[in-house]
Amino acid sequence: MFAEPETWVAIAFVILMGVFAYVGVHRTVLTTLDRRSARIKGELDDARRLKDEAAKLLADYRARHASAEREAQDIIASAKAEAERIAAEAKVKMEDFVARRTKSAEGKIASAEAQAIADVRAAAADAAVAAAAAILSQSVKGQVADDLLANGVNEVRAKLN
């Protein structure tokens, strides 16, 4: 039995464990393991805290992004509505401008037409007066002719103008 190497290894192991127990190596090992466990637990707690902060930041970013998207959509809708309003207003102004210009042109045309009719009537009256004067001066002579001519000319002018 003492000749077996396994026996001496077992005896050496038991003696070594006894020395370790006497010196208090197990307490040192346990203390070191406890410190290491506490450090790892602290690191895990820090990692959990950082993960929670990152999740909060991500949620905040997503909320801000959604808010910015809504605001951008509102701005776009407002700009479209404003553009449509301006276009409608410009169309109304253009139609009003065209209507006023048309009415003004029609007024000018009517005025020119009335002036042309008046000019033609005046020319016709002058021609009729001249023709009547020529006819009367040839057919009637003397003071009666002058009176008739003056009255007739005035009467024709009054009626034709």
From Swiss-Prot:
Function, as annotated, reads: F(1)F(0) ATP synthase produces ATP from ADP in the presence of a proton or sodium gradient. F-type ATPases consist of two structural domains, F(1) containing the extramembraneous catalytic core and F(0) containing the membrane proton channel, linked together by a central stalk and a peripheral stalk. During catalysis, ATP synthesis in the catalytic domain of F(1) is coupled via a rotary mechanism of the central stalk subunits to proton translocation.
The similarity comment for this entry is: Belongs to the ATPase B chain family.
Protein name (Swiss-Prot/TrEMBL): ATP synthase subunit b 1
For this UniProt entry, which segments traverse the membrane? 5-25
Q: One Pfam family this chain carries? A: ATP-synt_B
| PANTHER family hit by this protein | ATP SYNTHASE SUBUNIT B, ATP SYNTHASE SUBUNIT B', CHLOROPLASTIC
Q: Which UniProt keywords apply?
A: ATP synthesis, Cell inner membrane, Cell membrane, CF(0), Hydrogen ion transport, Ion transport, Membrane, Transmembrane, Transmembrane helix, Transport
What gene name does this entry carry? Answer: atpF1
Q: Report how it sits in the membrane.
A: Single-pass membrane protein
What organism is the protein native to?
A: Nitrobacter hamburgensis (strain DSM 10229 / NCIMB 13809 / X14)
